[in-house]
Structure formats: structure tokens, C-alpha cells
């Protein structure tokens, strides 16, 4: 039985992690943490997330280095802002814990990215070099040996899963930059209240065009340039991405369908559509990334959908956890 800490357990993704680990056959939650200024300190998890009453009644504890030092901790999940994870990762690695970081603090190797997109200078370059990018379907062998797994961003996950097979097999015309329009529910902005994600204020609008933090992440890990246009939608959870590309040759629908099926046939959390398109309704509260597409002449439009809190965050983190410790990839997820 593996002992697990979860930091940032009051947030949306953190709560999903608590749920997954609680029902995991081979792991046990030792403690759950929130920030030192949180109003939830001392409250039960089930007070904040009432659906877990009499199921998960653990108390929230404040983050500080004294309480974080626990004996016999095997793994730590950080569902925290990047500046918190940035500081905590070295600490937990020094305690020989395997760390699963859901923030953007260690996802990208190019240190210039952190100054430009995150506003800080990355000083833990030795750790950054050792971090493994946790795109579970593509980096399984690296994840098996990693001590720090940087769980990909929500947008970055579904976009890469949709594009990587085409890039790997050199199906795309290099002269045409993929154009990505993706819509996320407001839970992607976190749990803290602000005017941006207020129900009465959100309609459907683009944001952070050319400046979104997932842009350099997508570009670095795909290895090609893209134009990424994120949108905020007036729904709670889920991401739908529409990706327009140009193919190198006159590939048929069956050619592309066979490619996706070949690449993902052993990947239980990827569902490839032969008919119709994915929808947010089909993936909300489920751990899947659904992929569909249509071709006209040499153009292909790929539609990818996922739950941003699950396959885009907690479910993928648990998937990486399972891979790292040799469990079934879908243990506690399905």
C-alpha cells in the first residue's frame, strides 16, 4: 500500500485527485493540504465537497514545511499554482518522494518560457532537466522511471493527443501551421471567485490569444509551430478543440482512421470516432479524450474533447501514478 499526500485538495482538480486516490486499491491518503491562508483549514473534505459525506471525511491541514514532513510517503500530488509547486517540488524530491505536479512549473524545458509566460526566472534547472512530461499515452517508458512527473495542461493534453499521430507519421503539410480553436469551461480558471468566471459575466469569448501559457508547452512537445486561440465558455467543465490542418497527400478518411486506431488501440482512455464528432457531453465526468475528424480535399479538421478536470488534470495524474508504480493504467480511473 502506497502512502500519498495531496497538496491543494480544496480545488477542483485536487478534489478529483482525493476521490481517485481514496478508491485506489493500492494507495492510501495520509493527509490533504491547503494553503496557510485558506479558510478551509480544519474543515473536513466532505464539508467542502458534500457529495463525499461519510465517504471522505479527512480534515484539511495548512501547508507548512513542518507538517509536510511525513514518514514513509511514497508519492505527492501538487494541485497548486505554479509558484507553489516551484518551491515544493525540490523539497519533496529531497525526501525521496515521487512527485506528480499538476502545475506548469516543470512542464517546459526552455527556461526563457517561464520568464515570458509565467513571470519568473526558473532557478531549478537541474530539476527541470530531470522532469518527465506526463503525456501518458506517449511517454510511458519515461514515466516508469521518473521521480518528477509534470502533468500536462488541460488544453495541451487534448491538442497533443489529436495531433501527435499525424506529426509522428509525417502526414501534415509543413507549410500550413495548424490552427487550434479550443473552448474550456470556467472550472479551468480555478475555484476562487472572480468577475472573469462569474456565471452572470461569462458568455463565450477568446482570451490570452498568443500569450496563453499552454502555447509554448504545446509547441515544445509537438515540435511544430501552432496558432492557439483559447476561449472561455459558459459551462462548468470540459474542453472542445477544433484543429485545422493541411495534409501532405490526398489521404482518405480510412487512412486517417486507421492511423489513429493503430496508434491508440492499446490506449484505454482514448476513443476514436468513426462517425459523428466528439462532444463535451460525452466526456464530462469521464476520464477519456475523444477524437474525431473530417477531411475535405487536403484539409483535415480534428475535433478533440475531454473533461479538463479529469483527462486534462486529475485522471491523467493518476494514470501517470499507475504507470510509475506498475499498476493497471486505469486503476481507480474507470
Curated annotation (Swiss-Prot):
The keyword Methyltransferase does not apply. Pathway: Amino-acid biosynthesis; L-arginine biosynthesis; N(2)-acetyl-L-ornithine from L-glutamate: step 3/4. It catalyses: N-acetyl-L-glutamate 5-semialdehyde + phosphate + NADP(+) = N-acetyl-L-glutamyl 5-phosphate + NADPH + H(+). The keyword Cytoplasm applies. Belongs to the NAGSA dehydrogenase family. Type 1 subfamily. HAMAP family: ArgC_type1 (MF_00150). This is N-acetyl-gamma-glutamyl-phosphate reductase. It comes from Buchnera aphidicola subsp. Schizaphis graminum (strain Sg). The gene is argC.
